[in-house]
């Protein structure tokens, strides 16, 4: 009886499909070499005008990069000038890193808010 119930629960979960998180970040995965340039894109939740970017290097907590609100940079973390960003009139945002260095290997996240 127990294994039948577990199989049923798994089948129900598989049928549920993916849950949309709201914020879309592209590309999802990226591999670059030292010296190259990278651009990441973030589409916020509909109606959100603020977009923030974060970096998380292996074994470390999130580090704030910058925040944009209505196309204007409001806050900036303590990062080199190789890190830059912008926000468009539709609230979509891009983060750029020029001349990549080995220490730039990290998880980059964007978040949106009202």
Curated annotation (Swiss-Prot):
Main localization of the protein described in the UniProt heading: membrane
Domain of life: Eukaryota
Residue ranges constituting the Ig-like domain according to the UniProt record: 22-114
Gene Ontology, cellular component aspect: plasma membrane; T cell receptor complex
Carbohydrate attachment residues: 96
SUPFAM superfamilies xref list: Immunoglobulin (SSF48726)
UniProt entry tagged with the keyword Membrane: yes
Disulfide bond sites: 42-110
InterPro entries: Ig-like_dom, Ig-like_dom_sf, Ig-like_fold, Ig_V-set, TCR_beta_variable
GO-annotated biological processes: adaptive immune response; cell surface receptor signaling pathway
Entry keyword Metal-binding: no
Annotated localization: Cell membrane
Pfam families: V-set
Keywords, alphabetical: Adaptive immunity, Cell membrane, Disulfide bond, Glycoprotein, Immunity, Immunoglobulin domain, Membrane, Receptor, Signal, T cell receptor
Signal peptide: 1-21
Subunit structure, as described in the record: Alpha-beta TR is a heterodimer composed of an alpha and beta chain; disulfide-linked. The alpha-beta TR is associated with the transmembrane signaling CD3 coreceptor proteins to form the TR-CD3 (TcR or TCR). The assembly of alpha-beta TR heterodimers with CD3 occurs in the endoplasmic reticulum where a single alpha-beta TR heterodimer associates with one CD3D-CD3E heterodimer, one CD3G-CD3E heterodimer and one CD247 homodimer forming a stable octameric structure. CD3D-CD3E and CD3G-CD3E heterodimers preferentially associate with TR alpha and TR beta chains, respectively.
Job of this protein: V region of the variable domain of T cell receptor (TR) beta chain that participates in the antigen recognition. Alpha-beta T cell receptors are antigen specific receptors which are essential to the immune response and are present on the cell surface of T lymphocytes. Recognize peptide-major histocompatibility (MH) (pMH) complexes that are displayed by antigen presenting cells (APC), a prerequisite for efficient T cell adaptive immunity against pathogens.
Entry-linked PANTHER family: T CELL RECEPTOR BETA VARIABLE 5-1, T-CELL RECEPTOR BETA CHAIN
Protein name per Swiss-Prot or TrEMBL: T cell receptor beta variable 5-1
Taxonomic lineage: Eukaryota, Metazoa, Chordata, Craniata, Vertebrata
Gene: TRBV5-1
